[in-house]
Amino acid sequence: MNYFSMENHNFRQIKSEIRILGIDDAPFTPRSEEDVLLVGTVFRGGQWLDGVLTTTVRVDGDDATERIIEMVNGSRHLNQLRVIMLDGLTFGGFNVVDIVELSERTGLPVIVVVRKHPDMERIKRALKHRFSDWKARWRSIERAGRIHRVESREPLYIQTAGIEPDDAAEIVRISTTRSSIPEPLRAAHIIASGVTLGESRGSA
């Protein structure tokens, strides 16, 4: 079930150079009280990097949705963007993004992309164990709606707000050009880890 309350964006034709903002977080110290860097890369499809945006969120905090909204709405790229793509629903540990609110307040559809099907019950147990406000965090996760499998170079899993799953899947496939994940997310990961560690490591 998709909880998005507005009409989904109607993509009559998805162009190969659709402007995508891909967001990933940098490496961080788990369960710390530090801020973690978020990097957003503006891509034309999966081919050309047009810009880089940054913000920070608190590790295991509750500010990810608001900080991403501020980053997007304050960007000179806003009018060219057609979709936001996130590497997972959480950043900096369990700082959960409410993708319905993100879509509503930016006016852009949101696609969450992960490599493996999330174990929702395990996530819920972890939230209950660690956070007094676990119910609010869990509501944001539930609002992301149904998980859909996408056949690309390798299978990926997506959740969406403000966009039909079939359109989201096509955008994922269009932007997956050089590895098994969409290029905007791959580039965001490389930049975020490189800036934080001095050299990029791992994969998104």
Swiss-Prot record:
Matching Pfam families: DUF99 (PF01949)
Domain of life assignment: Archaea
Gene3D superfamilies reported in the protein's UniProt record: archaeoglobus fulgidus dsm 4304 superfamily
Family, similarity comment: Belongs to the UPF0215 family.
Record protein name field: UPF0215 protein MTH_1316
Species per Swiss-Prot/TrEMBL record: Methanothermobacter thermautotrophicus (strain ATCC 29096 / DSM 1053 / JCM 10044 / NBRC 100330 / Delta H)
